[in-house]
A protein has these predicted regions:
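Zinc-dependent deaminase catalytic domain
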Residues: 1-175
Length: 175
């Protein structure tokens, strides 16, 4: 899940940053994706505000599937938030059997339609025998500490930090 949290910083979406990591039974990475503009399109050329941006953005789960290598049969996915119905279908169709989902909420309003979508996702999981596991995010800071300690040990923490700061600056954030 730590890798998913790090990957979501790459998203240029101004409201919601999601990421998805697909791994095999031995936890080897098969695919990585984050929500963002379609491939080959200049990021500056597309709308960044809803609802227009939705025509140009791809969800992290489908990007992870598109960017994957090898079979996803029997794989596990780590998603920073709850999957939508379209992404759930894509994951099931590609053989994902376990989904860990995290605390990042999408900016979708809590409407009867979004409640129905969540019920549909849970129903699909049940019907397809896909295990849904809510990631206990209360300890996510410990995960980040482990990741940063590892990156520091490998001597690449400053480079990763610089990439995150650069991403935040593009989004108008502060260091």
């Amino acid at each position: 899940m730590a890798m998913a949290f790090m990957t979501c910083t790459r998203s240029l979406d101004t409201n919601t940053k999601h990421a998805c990591i697909l791994v095999d039974q031995k936890h080897r990475v098969l695919g990585i994706g984050y929500n963002g503009p379609i491939r080959g399109v200049d990021d500056e050329a597309i709308p960044t505000e809803a609802p227009e941006k939705y025509f140009y953005m791809e969800h992290s789960e489908r990007n992870a599937v598109f960017n994957s290598h090898g079979s996803l049969e029997g794989s596990t996915t780590y998603i920073t938030g709850f999957p939508c119905t379209d992404c759930m279908r894509a994951l099931i169709q590609n053989g994902v059997v376990r989904i860990y989902w995290g605390p990042i909420k999408s900016t979708t309003r809590a409407t009867s339609q979004s409640v129905a979508a969540m019920k549909a996702v849970n129903s699909m999981a049940c019907l397809a025998n896909v295990e849904m596991i809510h990631y206990d995010h209360t300890g996510y800071h410990r995960v980040f500490n482990k990741v940063f300690t590892y990156l520091e040990h490998k001597g690449i923490l400053s480079r990763v930090y610089d990439n995150i700061v650069s991403c935040l600056k593009r989004l108008g954030g502060k260091k």
